[in-house]
Amino acid sequence: MVCLECIFYLSGILIKRFPCFSIRNSGVFILKEKNLPQFFEEYLKKGSVFKEKRVLQANHFPNDIPHRAVQIHQVRVVVAPALRLERPSNLFIYGKTGTGKTLVVKWVINGELVSAAKKAGVSIQTLYVNCKLDADTEYGLFTELATQVGKELPLTGLSTDDVCSAFFSKADSTKSILIIILDEIDYLMKKAGDDFLYKITRKNEELKNTQVAIIGISNDLMFAEHLDPRVKSSLSEEKLLFPPYNAIELQDILNNRASSAFKHSSLEPGVVEKCAAYAAREHGDARRALDLLRVAGELTDRKGATSVAVADVDSAEEKIDHDTVAELVTTQPRQAQLVLYSILNISHGAGKFIFTGEVYELYKKYCAKASLRPLTQRRVSDILSEFDMLGIITARVISKGRYGRTREIMLAPQAATPVVRRLLEEALNL
Ligand SMILES: Nc1ncnc2c1ncn2[C@@H]1O[C@H](COP(=O)(O)OP(=O)(O)OP(=O)(O)O)[C@@H](O)[C@H]1O
Ligand SMILES: [Mg+2]
């Protein structure tokens, strides 16, 4: 432990030896302005192509949502009965990543509906849970929901059913409509099964004051197909698909945001079009398009140039892919890295389906080389499912007639690169 006196003693020495430092009451050192390092001085003097960069960041809420009028209307239609204290139908929303699902749901429900309810004096509670980030177990989900309705829970000693009951009894304490938005619901279901959905729908029938509606959002298009039939019929009372954006639609989205994000004339002609075309080429992902534009701007600033050029979009694409894959690969546990390395060595590039059995055999050989105990085929199969969810591979189940079913996998292009190989070899010491 460092005592406060020591800190002040050391601060004194530091200030005497380095007079460019001063000390605030809080004890935090700050540099006196005139002694800023050259680098930062120059950085501050340099201009930037951005006027307001955060407009391009993923969590920024835009003030307009082009090309989603149909979906916005459909969500409004489904949730409107809540304003008359009638339970809205459960809604299941699906579409690929970056197609505006989260944005539209938050816009209509947390924004428009909540304001309309306030105005009308109707009690509507809305709870939003991102199952991937905040609750990837059943226990985690009910704890999160209970916390959001203001129920204090002891830190230990409660079972999942206890937490579930505690949440519902608190939620049922006022006459209201409760809308639970379960974003990235497929993550929770893949980890915890669909029992939580069954619990919610069954509990709903027992409540006296509150009526619950669920809005599930998923980018796994086949997600609803895997549900228990009872849960499936209840969750899919209404379904809504968000199609991918095309290049022209992405241009509109980007232009809308670019006008407040960038300084006048700091985007050369063709930049927005190229970002839109690149993002449309993959799967019409608005997040990707916005990232490309933002990173192209950041790279321009780093170079000290005054306008973003078309070529900067290529550099941005390279940087984003490199950063994403590098993070994915290097943060995987060692066993998963070995599985990926085996896939890489069998695949010889992307675009070819390979059998999971072959992967397992090679993986076992690498384990022996690395003096690691191999996981069971079952566990390796779980790792492959995880890779599938992360977009590192694409998996498909094929029937082999009377020999049962087997799974084939294909490495995604962004994982079939020399960079990934090098990162894995470095991480695994191979
Ligand atoms: N029509 C639009 N207008 C303006 N911005 C949009 C539009 N559609 C999407 N975006 C922006 O693109 C990004 C991704 O959108 P969003 O998070 O809603 O996608 P999603 O479908 O929920 O993706 P995921 O399945 O990966 O969660 C966000 O920054 C969002 O603001
Ligand atoms: Mg989302």
Locate the predicted segments by residue:
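A short, basic N-terminal segment
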Residues: C6, F18, I23-R87
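Mid-core helix/loop region of P-loop NTP-binding domains shared across ATPases and GTPases
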Residues: K32-S48, P88, S123-Q125, L133-I253, ...
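Walker A/P-loop nucleotide-binding motif
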Residues: R87-W107
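Post-Walker A helix-loop "phosphate-sensing" segment adjacent to the P-loop in P-loop NTPases
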Residues: G111-G121, E152
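Conserved C-terminal helix/linker of AAA+ ATPases
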Residues: T300-D321
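Short alpha-helical segments that sit at the start of domains
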Residues: H322-K352
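Terminal-proximal interaction/regulatory segments of ATP-powered molecular machines
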Residues: G351-L430
